[in-house]
Swiss-Prot record:
Predominant localisation class: cytoplasm
Entry EC number(s): 2.1.1.177
Catalytic activity: pseudouridine(1915) in 23S rRNA + S-adenosyl-L-methionine = N(3)-methylpseudouridine(1915) in 23S rRNA + S-adenosyl-L-homocysteine + H(+)
Coiled-coil residue spans: none
Protein name as annotated: Ribosomal RNA large subunit methyltransferase H
Annotated organism of origin: Acinetobacter baylyi (strain ATCC 33305 / BD413 / ADP1)
Upper classification of the organism: Bacteria, Pseudomonadati, Pseudomonadota, Gammaproteobacteria, Moraxellales
Gene that this sequence comes from: rlmH
CC terms in the record's Gene Ontology section: cytoplasm
Length: 159
């Protein structure tokens, strides 16, 4: 199994890079993980709903274009399915046994397009809270690492 994180936005603040890189390095011995940063559509100050929809569509097209044919697409969004860490570990174990490569899609500030939602095999919510997309990167990689540490009997997870 390989995991690719397809994420909108290329210029992250230093605190995001620091937090993300720590867990990104930790997860590599457990599962090959890659991050694909895709450009965020340029936004204006007084964008209409139609403009925002257009931005989401542009970003969605770049996510779908980056998707490999053998990957299972998982959309990260508020309305997705919530999982406990233990359930995530079980789910990841199933993916590994089935040989699935996974692509996790993180939208931009306005979320994911309808095209990405429809293409996704699964919809996952890290929380009912709305979060800035840079924060999602850190929470996602930490939860992936935590799940893999459970599956490998590593002492990181102590719940």
């Amino acid at each position: 199994m390989k995991i690719r994180i397809l994420t909108i936005g290329q210029k992250m603040p230093a605190w995001v890079l620091t937090g993300f890189e720590d867990y990104f390095k930790r997860i590599q011995p457990f599962v090959q993980t890659q991050v694909i940063e895709l450009p965020m559509a340029k936004r204006g100050k007084n964008d209409s709903d139609a403009d925002i929809l257009k931005y989401c569509q542009i970003e969605g097209e770049s996510i779908l274009a980056a998707l490999k044919p053998n990957e299972v697409l998982i959309a990260l969004e508020v309305g997705g399915r919530e999982l406990s860490t233990e359930k995530l570990a079980d789910t990841m174990k199933s993916w590994m046994l089935e040989g699935h490569d996974i692509a996790l899609a993180i939208g931009g500030p306005d979320g994911l397009s309808d095209q990405v939602r429809k293409a996704a095999a699964w919809h996952w919510s890290l929380s009912k809270l709305t979060m800035p997309h840079p924060m999602v990167r850190i929470l996602l990689i930490e939860q992936l690492y935590r799940a893999m540490s459970i599956n490998h009997n590593h002492p990181y997870h102590r719940a």
